[in-house]
Amino acid sequence: MTSEKKTLNITEIQALLPHRYPFLMIDRVTDYEEGQTLTAYKNVSINEPLFTGHFPKMPIFPGVMILEAMAQATGLLAFKSFGAPSENELYYFASIDKAKFRKPVVPGDQLVLNVEFIKERRGIALFNGTAKVDGEVVCSAELKCARREF
């Protein structure tokens, strides 16, 4: 028995996340299962404005941006698991623990982001996240996000 993969294109992603260029870190979602896991992609391009300063002679995608991409992936999984946001509601990145950076990410790399839902309590959801390039883990972390009105 084969199960069809659930995907999200950029239009569907923008309907769920409030982020826009240059801060939208998810290019597409290739699979997700509500309440369980989500796989997303971030294509790292030299054309991103952050590379003018990080670092001019050796461009490296900042670790905090990898974590932001993971956080956006958790927001997408949370919305798909617990319902789409109302007009004045979103998931805020609440905390990060056990973050580890294992290898630099450079222009031309494709980040494969995997997030796994662990538990939810009082509107705060806990996730495990990993980012891989060419099958190698470049970053891992535990992330929490909180659903709140703004």
Swiss-Prot record:
Protein name in the entry: 3-hydroxyacyl-[acyl-carrier-protein] dehydratase FabZ
GO CC terms, sorted: cytoplasm; membrane
Which reaction equations make up its catalytic activity? a (3R)-hydroxyacyl-[ACP] = a (2E)-enoyl-[ACP] + H2O
InterPro entries listed in its UniProt record: FabA_FabZ, FabZ, HotDog_dom_sf
Q: GO terms for biological process?
A: fatty acid biosynthetic process; lipid A biosynthetic process
Q: Which GO terms describe its molecular function?
A: (3R)-hydroxyacyl-[acyl-carrier-protein] dehydratase activity
Q: Where in the cell is it found?
A: Cytoplasm
Q: Which residues form the active site?
A: 54
Q: Which UniProt keywords apply?
A: Cytoplasm, Lipid A biosynthesis, Lipid biosynthesis, Lipid metabolism, Lyase
Q: What is its main location?
A: cytoplasm
